Amino acid sequence: MEKGMVAMNEWIEKSKTYLWLPFTQMKDYEQHPLVIESGEGIFLTDVNGKTYYDGYSSLWLNVHGHRKKEIDDAIRAQLERIAHSTLLGAANIPAIALAEKLIEWTPSHLTRVFYSDSGAEAVEIALKIAFQYWRNIGENKKQKFVTLANGYHGDTVGAISVGAIDIFHTVYEPLMFTSYKAPFPLVYRHPSNDPNVVRDEALGALEALFAEHHEEIAAMIVEGMIQGAGGMHVMPKGYLKGVEQLCRQYNILFIVDEVATGFGRTGKRFAIEHEDVQPDIMTVAKGITGGYLPIAATLTTEAIYEAFYGDYTEFKTFFHGHSYTGNQLGCAAALANIQIFERERLIEQIQQKATFVAEQLASFNELNHVGDVRQLGLMCGIELVRDRRTHEPYPWTERMGYRTTLTMREKGMLTRPLGDVIVFMPPLASTFEQLEAMIAMMKEAIIETTEKRG
């Protein structure tokens, strides 16, 4: 055996021996291991030299492709100055510059930026800010949170407490604080199949919950326009705006989680722009650095910030912060990422690509085992079902989504399923030709797996 092949196999075996991969059953991984060695553009290459389309943007975050020169150069330039210094009590230039740019990019009422290292932490910060805000202004009864059924906001304890995906969260229930769960306006499988009816029913249920419990509710948290990990379900038109209006009516803070949806993913800078929504608190991560480094942020209003401002003896300080918060390398990457957005007018390109993808995905509705195709911008979910007419799902034990993504891998494309929902979230810079090729590969894999193996 050649030396190169020995080295490749060695990395694979070491991955099985030493690593514990996130959201991964390691028994499955041992049967189908994958070790990535490099990336270029929208492609990833494993240690065996096989190249794949990055069909899930390396978990929904890559924007311009891998090894984007401008971002690489920005990180190198920052390394010549300093890699990291703490943000606890001492600011740094990239963090200041990025905060200024984020304020410029987001709705005008958001004026303050609190950094963190991941989307889940950004959510934790949002929850803690909302909770402490009411205490700081003397409204101590407002301690509860409202979230949506099937929602997902990260995997830390606070984030799962406002999540509602049983397979992820049930085992940890004894650790979690209690939150109110409002129904999500799920159109697929609803008896009426009318988005307006579904929207109004969900808003009616939410208003009833608010009317009964508003005096104890600190905030409501929702994902921006589309539930990601819950199955790529798009909110009916007017729902998000309706939630905002109810929060205002009942004096409840409104948190929008844009971790997955922000930075162009839905065809707007941020998903809230689809309905001109103005949250009190907004979280961002994933695409903020173009998919390079772990930076996240929680943005809020001057009114909320002012509730924490005062003499130390007033005990209004927000006691939160991690060691690498506001890291200079990550902030430099994020600034370069946003500059590329602006220079290349990427939002306009994404809108054109989203239209193209919708046209390409239309034919999936003709497949025998595709029950629903859902899309907002370049966030897409294809739900596989046993019976398209009755919407009967596959038994979860058949793992049809997982098997289909393994077929896709064989063909040269990587993604991860959400149960039996195939996720298609390509890098935003993918060309029309690349999008067409990935969609064709995905369609072939669905047909091959569901027809021949299902």
Curated annotation (Swiss-Prot):
Transmembrane segments: none annotated. GO terms for biological process: biotin biosynthetic process. It is found in: Cytoplasm. NCBIfam families: bioA (TIGR00508). CDD domains: OAT_like. It comes from Anoxybacillus flavithermus (strain DSM 21510 / WK1). It holds the Pfam family Aminotran_3. Its main location: cytoplasm. Pyridoxal 5'-phosphate binds at G119, A120, D257. Belongs to the class-III pyridoxal-phosphate-dependent aminotransferase family. BioA subfamily. The modification N6-(pyridoxal phosphate)lysine is found at K286. Keywords: Aminotransferase, Biotin biosynthesis, Cytoplasm, Pyridoxal phosphate, S-adenosyl-L-methionine, Transferase. It comes from the Bacteria. The record marks F23 as: Participates in the substrate recognition with KAPA and in a stacking interaction with the adenine ring of SAM. Homodimer. Substrate binds at Y152, K286, G321, R416. One of its GO terms (cellular component) is cytoplasm. This is Adenosylmethionine-8-amino-7-oxononanoate aminotransferase.
